[in-house]
């Protein structure tokens, strides 16, 4: 995300300031002209016109919120949060920062790190209309598409959880189909041929290939979304389902399968490792080389 945004800003003569808890990650952007802000979110909130954040969980977002409001923030600062968090957390953070004069929107992103690098992310954008109009060019610089989810920021994170439910369900579906094929004498290539012919979309093709090839380890050259992150996101879906009295049976199954992988020490594998749990339940080996 940040590399594409830096490229866009550089062309328009503007600068990008970056911060990461792991400063070495932020430093990678220095080589393309970004400025590393070593003094953290408070300094960014004081100096910047627009602030983008991508944080792991609700606790991290709330901590950054405390720092932004304590800065104090620059007048009319716009903050666009791209994290996958619980909608009530988005609503809470929005109310708090807005009381300090900050204009807040949510634009959580669909896509793994490799999609971000290739500018293939999809954003679920929610916030006041004039704000969205003003920062849309920045988001377009980081995405291939934007889904407008209205004026309430928490609807952006609700959209993200609904979308991630689709993705998690696809992973479970592929895992079960591949396991059925394995046990019934079909080749995995037969499964991939069906996917590529009948269901040619990036999510199903991508995870279909990854699962069929047992390509579950994550590395810098083979990015993915880890089991630990999957548990967090599916946990948020289930929490929202409980709060709204909605049955998400597939989410419950995926959560159980991810928990099994975490218990086996596979927390850093891609969440496509759901297939290992399905295989084990079906009497096949449930291990793969990391």
Name each model-derived stretch.
Residues 55-67:
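Glycine/threonine-rich flexible loop motifs
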Residues 16, 36-37, 103-105, 146, ...:
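Hydrophobic beta-strand scaffold residues
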Residues 12-13, 33, 101, 185, ...:
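Glycine-centered short loops/turns at secondary-structure junctions
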Residues 155-281:
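Helical "substrate-binding/catalytic lid" subdomain
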Residues 1-53, 73-78, 83, 92, ...:
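NAD(P)+-binding Rossmann beta1-loop-alpha1 motif at the extreme N-terminus of oxidoreductases
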Residues 84-168:
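Rossmann-fold dinucleotide-binding core
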Residues 1, 29, 48-51, 61, ...:
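Buried hydrophobic positions in well-ordered alpha/beta secondary-structure cores of metabolic enzymes
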Residues 23-24, 58, 129:
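Helix N-cap at the beta1-alpha1 junction of Rossmann-like dinucleotide-binding domains, i.e.
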